[in-house]
């Protein structure tokens, strides 16, 4: 469980209606199976000790006595199981019958959570048998122990403070104000739901959405264990659709109509960090809850969950296309507002034939369509110099032509050579000065020509470059409005590809596809045999790794060793551990060292959950030390 990952399980035993001894054997069999997978939190269905469909047999004393005896047996038989276990049963108390979840840990019964909302509509008539536990807060004597009985219990792990668990039962989730809301506000990072939800057409997707939505709304893990085969089919069928969700993401789902166990690793540290980040999330002491301690051994959890290698890019094409369309619209609407505000009808962009300037031009073209402005008011400036290749030059020319934009070529070789002479720089020394002189010359030309034309200079730099500081200060770092500032490099490719696929123009599509096939490069060093010699990813590392690091550092707040661990799992077979660690160190070093560039960024629209604007998402001092983070990385062993 180190780094916050906790192995959880939801299982459906094969019940025999009203046969508590048979059900006890089935429940213990499921628990033992969960134990082999090292689950530390185990959840079984509602009323699983008796079966949910006992109907009026719940009024029989013999059944209730047998259920209680079975609970004691299950507790005794699981004394050696290192887990917090939830099982469901009917329980008498103070002249009423309650539908409860019993929490077990190392042979001890820790507490009883009664069902709050008792359905009595359509196929449900639970009020015939059960009372609501909404206003019940008392203790029950079990042997020589006093055990709490209430709907507001939170079970807290003594060895891992973020592992806090609350319980609700079936219908409790389906009401306007579920008990889980109060439990989450009280500090529960995981909600378990013991359910017996019958099947009917359309209910599967609704149930899934309900669990996902509640986990997102409460910023929690949600474990849903429901009844399955073995329940009476007199009038209903139960499908066993067990679900495990974390903050809006489905981690595991059982195939229906099979009694199975599902597993997942919920990251309770991330949930705690996310709640702390949200200033509107109530503090834990705002809710009236009772804390019940439990113990499990805090050990390393073997990870089976998958982490998206491209967290900024949806893996499903339909969703990805929708995302691309949305992002292009956000970028265009941001630029439209700025141009409208300053009464500007012209835009200028430095066009290199690379990905970023291509995307910026596509956004400008869409903006002009929205504003009803002529495409010739788009001024594209291409500025070849020492590193420019024929491929990128030709693509820049073709792209501007396809979009109907005006293209001007300004060869900057002579100007840069004059500048070298002015500052006494040897043009055979290809150092940072050699490169930055070109970048700043281009920016000066663009700024001045924008003034000449009365145009808005649109910046092209993307989120990944800003994170790494891969931009020349007051060179390509500067513009009048940066449309790509919150678009990571891995997403830039998909945006350009989406535009190519949907533009409906063959020539434009071919140009965009060739740009996509061109190596990423600033083209500041002379080419070799007419081909790009300076490749960005050879110098600063693969953007797919850096975008992965960026997402989990800023969006998830993960520590360096945690990012390293999940990166090794995610990119296994693509990069070895040494390579992953090498570029992770470079990422942290550059991210801290280059903050001064981000502290004075031009305006630009936020499009995703990760952004670096000093006016919005990242308030970070330019002179902060990376020592604490680098120290953690130095301790890692490859």
Q: What residue ranges belong to the model's regions?
A:
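ATP/NTP-dependent adenylation/nucleotidyl-transfer catalytic domains that generate, transfer
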Residues: 18, 23, 161-163, 219-220, ...
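Enzyme catalytic cores with a strong preference for nitrogen-chemistry domains
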Residues: 1-350, 366-375, 407
